[in-house]
Amino acid sequence: MEASAGLVAGSHNRNELVVIRRDGEPGPKPVKHTNGQVCQICGDDVGLTPDGEPFVACNECAFPVCRDCYEYERREGTQNCPQCKTRFKRLKGCARVPGDEEEEDVDDLENEFNWRDKTDSQYVAESMLHGHMSYGRGGDLDGVPQHFQPIPNVPLLTNGEMADDIPPEQHALVPSFMGGGGKRIHPLPYADPNLPVQPRSMDPSKDLAAYGYGSVAWKERMESWKQKQERLHQMRNDGGGKDWDGDGDDADLPLMDEARQPLSRKIPISSSLVNPYRMIIIIRLVVLGFFFHYRVMHPVPDAFALWLISVICEIWFAMSWILDQFPKWFPIERETYLDRLTLRFDKEGQQSQLAPVDFFVSTVDPMKEPPLVTANTVLSILAVDYPVDKVSCYVSDDGAAMLTFEALSETSEFAKKWVPFCKRYSLEPRAPEWYFQQKIDYLKDKVAPNFVRERRAMKREYEEFKVRINALVAKAQKVPEEGWTMQDGTPWPGNNVRDHPGMIQVFLGQSGGHDVEGNELPRLVYVSREKRPGYNHHKKAGAMNALVRVSAVLTNAPYMLNLDCDHYINNSKAIKEAMCFMMDPLVGKKVCYVQFPQRFDGIDRHDRYANRNVVFFDINMKGLDGIQGPIYVGTGCVFRRQALYGYDAPKSKKPPSRTCNCWPKWCICCCCFGNRTNKKKTAKPKTEKKKRLFFKRAENQSPAYALGEIDEGAPGAENEKAGIVNQQKLEKKFGQSSVFVASTLLENGGTLKSASPASLLKEAIHVISCGYEDKTDWGKEIGWIYGSVTEDILTGFKMHCHGWRSIYCIPKRAAFKGSAPLNLSDRLHQVLRWALGSIEIFFSNHCPLWYGYGGGLKCLERFSYINSIVYPWTSIPLLAYCTLPAICLLTGKFITPELTNIASLWFMSLFICIFATGILEMRWSGVGIDDWWRNEQFWVIGGVSSHLFAVFQGLLKVIAGIDTSFTVTSKGGDDEEFSELYTFKWTTLLIPPTTLLLLNFIGVVAGVSNAINNGYESWGPLFGKLFFAFWVIVHLYPFLKGLVGRQNRTPTIVIVWSILLASIFSLLWVRIDPFLAKNDGPLLEECGLDCN
């Protein structure tokens, strides 16, 4: 894909395709090709014969094999060609081996009869080298079908790659997941367990030292072997066993030496920390049982309505607590080994074998998501510490704004200077705005004069870049009447946001766009999908699915990372951290995504509105990681492309050591005999087998697409017919694009080499057309799932239902950082959007309460998903419960009868358990008490405001069909630090918590006044009511502080609402008249006394 192709705009349905070039763009550069042959056994060049001709080992099929491997195969191997199985004939210059045909030529006697000094050092070295090598090349050959690849005669454990700096005696399998990358395979020696071990033949006349036994080298090797076994044993013990869901091991991949050690490690929470936590949860459950038994069996006759409401609310809170608490039963942490990843896949001086990654950045409105913020995110991606040819950045502009397009063009030019500067000095973070804002002494570790000089120059360059971006923003404030035009006078295709063609522009790429030092830059692609009236575009989920298809056509990396436009890469090695899980041979096969926690910049020190969400990211997510993995939170997540395509997770193979070891031998024989009988009955002739691709439907009635086994021996006509049927099925699922459908079958990624750039561009425009997803499974079973504004929950839920597991990765340095809303109104609107999405899922077909049973979803993982969609409903009992204290104080009644000693014991035990649970959670997770308390406060604030409105809006949408649109949270900020913190924006979300505050304040005043008026005996019952009211007020305190703001900026609307509500409750207070003394004596009418 060429970077200089220009902006490509078009519509597949209208058969339009236009290429708009920018002024001064050079033409496309020719692409260089190499035509050298590589040995398919060892990976070296095939080489030439002494006559200068290419060396050909097999005259039948000309399979590429070098001379050394040819001689070794004839001398020590099968003597057959790995491809056509024809016996190798002796070539001129090669030694004769048993079985060769008789030859009359005598021009090569020396080599024919192998007259060579066996003690020659070169000969010995070659023999030792060949003794540790075997044949097989992992990658598919260019132009050769997969089923024609060489098949070794001994079973191989796996495919792999050799680490060249490891001594030959330590060579081991190094798995690789790269397709077409030239993988070398070094299999373990295969030994049939049914045969006796063959002793090594030795000449009695020779000293044992000649064989290595008893020598110093032999002793050193033995000591080295023992140390390795000890390290492996220790590593296994440190691993902490298996995951709760049984993942983590693969019987086909035994651990061997350092080159085969895992790339990551699971670290369970210490039992001294987590066991008391589990015990207090069980105790709290028991106490809750006794507590509810007392509450239900002891109603309050004179306040039955208040008692009934309170009991219902408390039961709901208990159920909500169970759903939230038990998914945290198995908390774990993880550790990665980047040095092992580098040793295995990214060795210095060699071509990197790390898997390619496609980066997705989504933006909608450049006025609410400033282009400078998006530019910093893109720059941090382009400068990431990852091989350049493995990185591709796709920016989705769902608003089709020319401002975003021009800002991205400026960003690509500035990247040519910024990227080499970051990599030369290993800067962190690599987003220039945040790097230059760091309040650190940058001269502390960088004392080189060149760095100081270049840093100052780069800062000037960045300030000029900001001026250009801000000038574009200022220019975009006033839209011309005729619409925007490009530099060459062409009208901007996206002038009509709701009706425009699809647009693609490659700014940087392999064939164009090098930095100032002449080095290649990662690919940068601008994408704006087609939009037409009458089509449902599914908001962000639809945009992400369009990026999935475009990237599959152009680059098709096996892994994808999605980021919001305001989340930049704070740790340049974050992608390698994710690859430690994805490319790990032990745990990587079943991992669908690696989720990183969200961290934020620009939040005030006290985190008044719980923007950091520390409790969720550092407690809940760690607990889920011990079950089936964390839920997807919408950004900062590395996906496996195949998992997004709706494929089922690979099934785990049960190790042989775990089967039938505890059964008698006669039982094993019976089982084995029964299996053989069944196999004989179900066996089919080879002629009936055919290569096929089938789809299977899971028990949960959700289609899952899994590749079936590929068998050989099918006749050509039947095979072709089956292929046509399978192609039709795939197009029905994935859409009418043959290029994209073909890419979905490449598990390790890669693009079609036969396709031209022009055809790829045309296909890319096709897959982002507005009608491409019609009558397909996009948004239903494939990609980001539609049906909710919180598409992230549904997407992760579907993958977990297919049996995949996810991983939670918390690097020491935060992987990504973003911006969070600082003022109260924006924060409440953000929470409203999340809660509304949960309500939409609750009423959808994908509700975790009834969807996905019989699939791969774990029970406790389901608890977590159920909690994520029912939590907004807690707002109704929470609002009622927060109103009860004021009603009790105003009416003089209470929700419980007079407490006995036993009742007091249950109440005190419950309070102690609640506090103990929180303390022990903070203890094992490392969360501070400030963060924990802020989370508790905002749970009440959000519950009585945003969550409550989300419930009513969701009901309106389901019952009346009234759809509520959400607004994008503003990412811009004032120049003054924390200036947005005190900005007040009126919204109806503020009415319920404001009313609760005033109501409880009036109730407290009324209760105290009533107690003063009635004497000392009324103070006892008052304490319980006052504690209840102050519990509500303390939880709403951050809301009160945000509502009032600065003393000189108290908004008028707050004063008006306060006076209005205070007047209403004052009238109610006068009606109650608490200062009037109450006569508790007998009624005169009843006693019969006439006081007149």
From Swiss-Prot:
Cofactor: Mn(2+); Zn(2+)
Iron-sulfur found in the keyword field: no
Cited Pfam families: Cellulose_synt, zf-UDP
Ranges in the topological domain labelled Extracellular: 301-302, 890-901, 960-987, 1041-1049
Coiled coil residues, start to end: 450-479
GO biological processes: cell wall organization; cellulose biosynthetic process; plant-type primary cell wall biogenesis
A Gene Ontology molecular function term of the record: zinc ion binding
Binding-site list for UDP-alpha-D-glucose: S362, K368, E369, D398, K539
Function: Probable catalytic subunit of cellulose synthase terminal complexes ('rosettes'), required for beta-1,4-glucan microfibril crystallization, a major mechanism of the cell wall formation.
Amino-acid positions noted as binding Zn(2+) 2 in the UniProt annotation, renumbered to this chain: C58, C61, C81, C84
Cytoplasmic side: 1-279, 324-868, 923-938, 1009-1019, 1071-1092
Binding residues annotated for Zn(2+) 1, in chain numbering: C39, C42, C66, C69
Cellular compartment(s): Cell membrane
Binding site for Mn(2+): K540, D564
Catalytic activity from the UniProt record: [(1->4)-beta-D-glucosyl](n) + UDP-alpha-D-glucose = [(1->4)-beta-D-glucosyl](n+1) + UDP + H(+)
Entry protein name: Probable cellulose synthase A catalytic subunit 5 [UDP-forming]
Key word Phosphoprotein present: no
Cofactor binding notes: Binds 2 Zn(2+) ions per subunit.
Pathway listed: Glycan metabolism; plant cellulose biosynthesis
Catalytic residues (UniProt): D398, D792
PROSITE patterns with a match to the protein in the record: ZF_RING_2 (PS50089)
InterPro entries attached to this UniProt entry: Cellulose_synth, CES_Znf_RING, Nucleotide-diphossugar_trans, Znf_RING, Znf_RING/FYVE/PHD
One cellular component term from this protein's GO annotations in UniProt: plasma membrane
UniProt KW keywords: Cell membrane, Cell wall biogenesis/degradation, Cellulose biosynthesis, Coiled coil, Glycosyltransferase, Manganese, Membrane, Metal-binding, Transferase, Transmembrane, Transmembrane helix, Zinc, Zinc-finger
TM spans (from-to): 280-300, 303-323, 869-889, 902-922, 939-959, 988-1008, 1020-1040, 1050-1070
EC number: 2.4.1.12
